[in-house]
């Protein structure tokens, strides 16, 4: 099984945003979830975002990961939205793979080295999909803190083919004999068999008594 991260520069270790595009977004070494760099989305009464197109195949279900935190205290974090959308090769919208809303003031404080680690599974890419559009944005609200973003990943997990069938295991021991079942009904009488051979002649019996003398002529 192989795991491929479709996002390029997801940890911002290039020291710049590209190939991400963004608005009110910069990179910084002041904070990081891993490595040295992260992205900062400006808080307050402005909309800030980073976005990137990545290649996908139709039918793929992907795993999305990102680490988020807010910068500074006591300012609350703004509402944050995360979207993964599917497009064809002509940039026609085909469907939503993921929409996640993180409510107002739900992000931990980055200065405490605490992060909200997001892990979500997308719906499979519909037929005709060639690209996924990843968008991470804040919603404008005065007085809210900057948002720190790091370790963005969209993982394609590819499983290997089915291996050959293993050898048959040994035969298990014979189980105990079950209880004797009930006697079945008496079957029908069979046909009369053929007559047997004539037996041997018996022994001669004893001579009978002498009969009476007849009358004188």
Positions of predicted regions on the chain:
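Extracellular glycan-recognition surfaces and repeat-rich motifs
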Residues: 2-42
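Extracellular carbohydrate recognition and processing domains
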Residues: 93-128
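Extracellular polysaccharide-targeting segments
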Residues: 1-15, 114, 122-130, 135-172
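Extracellular beta-rich ligand/substrate-recognition surface
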Residues: 37-48, 110-111
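Short acidic, gly/pro-rich beta-turn/loop elements at beta-sheet edges
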Residues: 20-22, 49, 74-78, 92-94, ...
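Collagen/collagen-like triple-helix recognition
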Residues: 157-217
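Cysteine-dense, low-complexity repeat segments
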Residues: 1-3, 11, 27-31, 72, ...
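Extra-cytoplasmic beta-strand recognition segments
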Residues: 12, 46-88, 118-122, 132-134, ...
